[in-house]
Amino acid sequence: MSQRITIDHRSAPALRHPEKAHRPDNPIQRKPSWIRVKAPNHPVYHETRALMRDAGLVTVCEEAACPNIGECWSQRHATMMIMGEICTRACAFCNVTTGLPKHLDEDEPRRVGEAVAKLGLKHVVITSVDRDDLEDGGAMHFARVIHAIRETSPQTTIEILTPDFLRKDGALEVVVAARPDVFNHNIETIPRLYPTIRPGARYYQSVRLLDGVKKLDPSIFTKSGLMLGLGEERMEVAQVMDDFRIADVDFLTLGQYLQPSAKHAAVEKFVTPDEFDGYAAAARSKGFLQVSASPLTRSSYHADSDFAKLQAARNSRLKESL
């Protein structure tokens, strides 16, 4: 007769990544000099942090342990993460907590709109955790956040960084109908590495998502990015670039993968700044409107100034076609 064992989870410390607990440790390598950043200590950084706390908002800057948080928050640039801080996926590279999310906060769109107005942002980036537990993957919540920002800050341009809405019929149409200025969905890595790095996702689903945005509304800028240093080969990155161009992706970002903990995927290589320059040159030759490639490049890094460059590049290309 089997014995039933009851575990009292209330007395156990919460694990940020319980699904990774059984994995062998991957030693964290010392970062090269070109990746190190200063600890945040600017007064505006603390003001931005306090505003996020007071509004009860989550930022991907903190949850994903972004190395650029000091620089960005010192300029009042914070990427807000909606729909909670718990993700239903368990990607091998990501520092966001995995688990069973809470119910959606129906008041969150209003608070995001107010925070954007208080920060006086000209350009805002909104991202989210994956919400596979929701029927629409959180698409309507994204739309409500976009509408709330339009109400409080009609001149602010809006960039969204979305999940893949895998098996969520109609979700993409809902988000695109809300008309963000930039629709970003990150591929993250090359298709060969998906089974180990991004096991809950499908590479071609992500490519189709980006292609679908352009088919629904060609005026919306599309954007996607990869982390380098996970074991990819140069030709594999070039193939992803080609897939992006077939899907008419406008903006490509390339940055160095940094290992959040010993339980996460190991850094296979620190890609040098010169190598990033080479990737950027290759991407520009393929026709992207905008390319950002450097060790510290992240999806929303310098997003405001990059959006201005993106608009200028489109206008220039339109003039050339006349």
Curated annotation (Swiss-Prot):
[4Fe-4S] cluster 1 binds at C61, C66, C72, S300. GO terms for molecular function: 4 iron, 4 sulfur cluster binding; lipoate synthase activity; metal ion binding. It comes from the Bacteria. It is found in: Cytoplasm. It catalyses: [[Fe-S] cluster scaffold protein carrying a second [4Fe-4S](2+) cluster] + N(6)-octanoyl-L-lysyl-[protein] + 2 oxidized [2Fe-2S]-[ferredoxin] + 2 S-adenosyl-L-methionine + 4 H(+) = [[Fe-S] cluster scaffold protein] + N(6)-[(R)-dihydrolipoyl]-L-lysyl-[protein] + 4 Fe(3+) + 2 hydrogen sulfide + 2 5'-deoxyadenosine + 2 L-methionine + 2 reduced [2Fe-2S]-[ferredoxin]. Pathway: Protein modification; protein lipoylation via endogenous pathway; protein N(6)-(lipoyl)lysine from octanoyl-[acyl-carrier-protein]: step 2/2. Keywords: 4Fe-4S, Cytoplasm, Iron, Iron-sulfur, Metal-binding, S-adenosyl-L-methionine, Transferase. Residues 1-25 have a biased composition (Basic and acidic residues). Its cofactor is [4Fe-4S] cluster. One of its GO terms (cellular component) is cytoplasm. The keyword Transferase applies. Residues 1-29 are annotated as: Disordered. It is an enzyme of class 2 (transferase). SUPFAM superfamilies: Radical SAM enzymes (SSF102114). InterPro entries: Aldolase_TIM (IPR013785), Elp3/MiaA/NifB-like_rSAM (IPR006638), Lipoyl_synth (IPR003698), rSAM (IPR007197). Residues 73-289 form the Radical SAM core domain. PANTHER family: LIPOYL SYNTHASE, LIPOYL SYNTHASE, MITOCHONDRIAL. Belongs to the radical SAM superfamily. Lipoyl synthase family. This is Lipoyl synthase. The lineage of its organism: Bacteria, Pseudomonadati, Pseudomonadota, Alphaproteobacteria, Acetobacterales. The gene is lipA.
